[in-house]
């Protein structure tokens, strides 16, 4: 899948790199207009900063909420990073499907969302990097 960036996203990426000095892999707006930055492995600490200082600085300068996610070449670990801070019992799967086992019904509801919107959003993010069919929650 070919990824295209508009001027606005390029500006956000530049600002992110200038403030955090972390190597950025990708940047996009999700369905909820949340600006999501995907950083390379082992760069998450540098991107967040002490006590979330850099995140707060970025949110203030960009005037919007942001989410920073660490990329992982392992599909299941990347999925865990995407759904963080929600806790799960396990994330399992094969090469085409991912099955997330929620701890309780509240977490399950937050993972799925109304009309499975949250789940489809997570699925679209994972599909940007891995060839999967679907994500399911048990």
Where are these regions (language model features)?
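RNA-contacting regions in translation and RNA-metabolism proteins
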Residues: 1-138
């Amino acid at each position: 899948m070919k990824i295209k960036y508009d001027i606005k996203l390029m500006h956000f990426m530049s600002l992110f790199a200038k403030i955090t000095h972390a190597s950025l892999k990708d940047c996009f707006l999700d369905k909820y207009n949340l600006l999501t930055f995907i950083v390379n492995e082992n760069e998450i600490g540098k991107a967040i900063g002490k006590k979330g200082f850099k995140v707060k600085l970025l949110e203030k300068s960009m005037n919007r909420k942001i989410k920073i996610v660490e990329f992982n070449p392992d599909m299941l670990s990347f999925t865990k990073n995407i759904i963080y801070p929600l806790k799960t019992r396990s994330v399992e799967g094969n090469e085409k499907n991912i099955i997330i086992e929620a701890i309780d019904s509240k977490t399950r509801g937050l993972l799925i969302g109304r009309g499975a919107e949250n789940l489809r959003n997570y699925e679209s993010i994972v599909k940007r990097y891995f060839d999967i069919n679907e994500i399911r929650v048990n």
